[in-house]
Amino acid sequence: MQQQASAMRPEGAQPLIARAPSGIIDPNTGKPVGADDPFFLGVNRELSDKGFFVAATDDLITWARTGSLMWMTFGLACCAVEMMQLSMPRYDAERFGFAPRASPRQSDVMIVAGTLTNKMAPALRKVYDQMPEPRYVISMGSCANGGGYYHYSYSVVRGCDRIVPIDIYVPGCPPTAEALLYGVMLLQKKIRRTGTIER
């Protein structure tokens, strides 16, 4: 078989050998992404020292939860366009373990993107109540954070934190997909820091 492969290769051509994967390199530091994260540093230190590591169940559950966050879309206005862009190939939020779900019963995170009106507030609370514990909420954009341009309108809720508890606020009008992605990464750090068993 090897003789056939070498017979098909032109004279003087080198065999193709893939380079060893080096991970995603941070252009600012030149190190792999996550090299400054204390969680991963501790895991790498234990693995290089012993060849295995011992972890508490809570740490294991927290680690698994940060890499498998399922988000419920609650797009109410123009911020929803930027929220949709987060799942497109340029940003690809699923590589961070952040995938969309259509049902609140399968979701861990709800992204409130846009202007929350008084008529929509009960629906927001109902969807939030249908999500399993532990559940997290990201408030995206000026309107969801505090009413935005419509703050003094008679029909607008002045911030969705009056209806549901908010974990991460993403400012902007509308915030870019990069800003939302940064908010997702902050939520993952918050989950790692606080844990998921007791919140």
Swiss-Prot record:
Binds 1 [4Fe-4S] cluster. One of its GO terms (biological process) is electron transport coupled proton transport. It is a peripheral membrane protein. It catalyses: a quinone + NADH + 5 H(+)(in) = a quinol + NAD(+) + 4 H(+)(out). Its EC number is 7.1.1.-. [4Fe-4S] cluster binds at C78, C79, C143, C173. Keywords: 4Fe-4S, Cell inner membrane, Cell membrane, Iron, Iron-sulfur, Membrane, Metal-binding, NAD, Quinone, Translocase, Transport, Ubiquinone. One of its GO terms (molecular function) is NADH:ubiquinone reductase (non-electrogenic) activity. One of its GO terms (cellular component) is plasma membrane. Its cofactor is [4Fe-4S] cluster. It holds the Pfam family Oxidored_q6. Its main location: membrane. It is found in: Cell inner membrane. NDH-1 shuttles electrons from NADH, via FMN and iron-sulfur (Fe-S) centers, to quinones in the respiratory chain. The immediate electron acceptor for the enzyme in this species is believed to be ubiquinone. Couples the redox reaction to proton translocation (for every two electrons transferred, four hydrogen ions are translocated across the cytoplasmic membrane), and thus conserves the redox energy in a proton gradient. NDH-1 is composed of 14 different subunits. Subunits NuoB, C, D, E, F, and G constitute the peripheral sector of the complex. Belongs to the complex I 20 kDa subunit family. This is NADH-quinone oxidoreductase subunit B 2. The lineage of its organism: Bacteria, Pseudomonadati, Pseudomonadota, Alphaproteobacteria, Hyphomicrobiales. The gene is nuoB2.
